[in-house]
Swiss-Prot record:
Protein name according to UniProt: UPF0637 protein LSEI_1198
Species of origin: Lacticaseibacillus paracasei (strain ATCC 334 / BCRC 17002 / CCUG 31169 / CIP 107868 / KCTC 3260 / NRRL B-441) (Lactobacillus paracasei)
Family: Belongs to the UPF0637 family.
Length: 201
């Protein structure tokens, strides 16, 4: 069973590139790989549409250590940035699960068609954001969803993220089993929107 714990945040206390990368490879990547064995089947209910996992490699890092790390799930075996995808990962103070459409997917101008109506029916608390390299986020409301969606459509570098953020001070971290169960439930809840985004592209 995959268990993400508060101890995982210690990876980001390493201040050098080599040390942090070593800790990411030793501590987080194995958990991401194990998580993928569960999440891929949750997303791949249609056997005609394969889902691939992509663990961040940080190959372009030469001096500064990565501020975050993740595993992404997409319908492309070659990568994930160019297509809608699901990302599960860490910053130094939070775990995130984002359904993401990055700027690289921009040629598909109608990629968000149908998403607003689906998002407003999600149970529980969710967040939206407009930039995957920034921690900034907003609670999921109709108004915030409209704002992020409009920005995505009108600003070239804007992105669209919808999902769940687990801050390090969230009480759920006291029960790693419950956290993992919640992540899986949210993957299932996001799957219809994931499928719609893939279809739109």
């Amino acid at each position: 069973m995959v268990l993400f714990t508060l101890e995982d945040f210690a990876v980001f206390k390493a201040t050098t590139l080599a040390t942090r990368m070593h800790l990411i490879r030793e501590q987080l990547d194995p958990k991401f790989a194990e998580a993928a064995t569960v999440i891929v089947p949750l997303l791949q209910t249609d056997q005609q549409q394969a889902i691939y996992s992509h663990i961040a490699k940080h190959q372009r890092r030469y001096r500064n250590p990565p501020p975050n790390t993740w595993v992404a799930f997409s319908t492309s075996s070659r990568g994930y940035k160019m297509v809608p995808h699901l990302a599960l990962g860490f910053w130094d103070d939070r775990l995130f699960l984002w359904l993401s459409v990055l700027r690289e997917s921009k040629p598909a101008s109608r990629v968000l068609t149908g998403i607003t109506a689906m998002a407003t029916t999600l149970p529980g608390k969710w967040q939206v954001a407009g930039e995957h390299t920034d921690k900034a986020m907003l609670p999921l409301t109709s108004a915030n969803l409209a704002t992020v969606g409009a920005r995505f459509q009108t600003i070239k570098k804007a992105e669209f993220l919808l999902g769940k953020v687990y801050l390090a001070d969230d009480p759920i971290w006291a029960d790693p089993v419950r956290l993992w169960q919640d992540i899986q439930q949210r993957v299932v809840a996001l799957k219809p929107m994931f499928d719609q985004l893939v279809q739109n592209v």
